[in-house]
């Protein structure tokens, strides 16, 4: 669905970082491969997302809006 605006655990604003995270991951996927855990960690470090709770919010988010829209 839609990414939560704030981290559920610490309250840090994460919605603004989600788009940049997805853009960087898609750049890696455009090369024909999945990002490695080290690359994901570097993306988070570059974005300034240090807490594991915030990282969890972004990594575990599943965007289902495109799958749900045909049923509305």
Curated annotation (Swiss-Prot):
Cofactor: Zn(2+)
HAMAP family the record matches: RNApol_arch_Rpo10
Role summary: DNA-dependent RNA polymerase (RNAP) catalyzes the transcription of DNA into RNA using the four ribonucleoside triphosphates as substrates.
Primary location class: cytoplasm
GO cellular component: a single term: DNA-directed RNA polymerase complex
Keyword Cell wall biogenesis/degradation: no
Pfam families: RNA_pol_N
PROSITE patterns associated with the record: RNA_POL_N_8KD (PS01112)
Name assigned to this protein: DNA-directed RNA polymerase subunit Rpo10
